[in-house]
A protein has these predicted regions:
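Signature of dsDNA virion morphogenesis modules
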Residues: 1-247
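Terminal short linear interaction segments
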Residues: 251-276
Length: 276
């Protein structure tokens, strides 16, 4: 028997029965998907190599944590079939990134004050190879990137997670804008959906999941609600790219003062030498 997320209370004997139900209820399914905010789930968690440019060899004690930390993280990637059955395609985030100067960076999609990492994350879209993201797939993806400064006073717990390199997955909280159904079916009544499948199947990185499912939702535009650090996400190709500490203002002041003192000592030494 076949069970799918679109019909949680139904079972299907064959894929043909499933595909028929998807087509018959497509309008309702699209409306339902558009009516809710999509978040991570724990179904598609996979191993991702730790590719952060600032990996740590051992855990950092709480007393040694910096007061702030800059991180660069991947919130979502296109051309990757996630456990919701969605294939986000290139261009999906362009309008939302253009329309918003900053975004919410949250802890596990919890929208309360205690779980805000920052409300000032800067979003961008970068073309990256899968190998840059720690995966062996060929080709490229458009990565939704957040660059955030984490303040220890605001969320010390997540600062510690990032500082130690423990955050390996992220997830986008989003609202669907445009999506279409694609089905790998040779039935005549599925012709429209098969054409869409044939068009987008070549760009799917994880084709093994597409082959297993036999259908997918092609999402061409979505609105970013927030981006979250998660333990397990529906798209596992979402690592932390960088985590680095910025010098504190008082550190810079101390360095400047030490430099001045050194120069003064040099001048005094010159004066003493000139006396002889």
């Amino acid at each position: 028997m076949i069970q799918v997320i679109e019909f949680p209370d139904r079972e299907f004997e064959t894929k043909a029965d499933l595909f028929k139900a998807l087509v018959e209820h497509k309008k309702e399914l699209v409306s339902l998907k558009k009516s809710v905010t999509k978040n991570a789930d724990a179904v598609a968690y996979g191993y991702i190599e730790n590719i952060s440019k600032n990996n740590v060899d051992k855990a950092i004690a709480s007393a040694d944590l910096p007061d702030s930390l800059n991180v660069k993280v991947v919130i979502n990637t296109t051309n990757f079939l996630d456990s919701h059955g969605d294939l986000h395609i290139n261009g999906i985030w362009n309008k939302s990134v253009s329309d918003n100067k900053t975004f919410l960076h949250l802890q596990e999609h919890n929208r309360d004050f205690g779980h805000v990492i920052t409300d000032n994350a800067k979003g961008s879209v970068e073309v990256m190879t899968w190998k840059q993201l720690g995966l062996s797939y060929e080709g490229t993806t458009e990565a939704l990137i957040f660059e955030s400064t984490i303040d220890k006073l605001r969320n010390g717990f997540m600062l510690k997670q990032y500082a130690n390199g423990w955050v390996k997955n992220h997830s986008v909280g989003m609202r669907y804008v445009n999506l279409e159904l694609a089905i790998n079916s040779e039935a005549e009544y599925d012709k429209e959906y098969k054409e869409r499948w044939d068009k987008y199947y070549p760009i799917v990185a994880n084709k093994e999941l597409a082959d297993e499912r036999g259908y997918m939702w092609i999402v061409s535009e979505a609105k970013i609600v927030e981006g979250s650090a998660v333990v397990m996400g529906s798209n596992s190709a979402t690592p932390t790219l960088e985590n680095k500490q910025e010098p504190l203002d008082n550190t810079l002041d101390n360095e400047a003062e030490q430099s001045l003192q050194t120069e003064q000592q040099k001048e005094k030494l010159k004066e003493l030498l000139n006396k002889f």
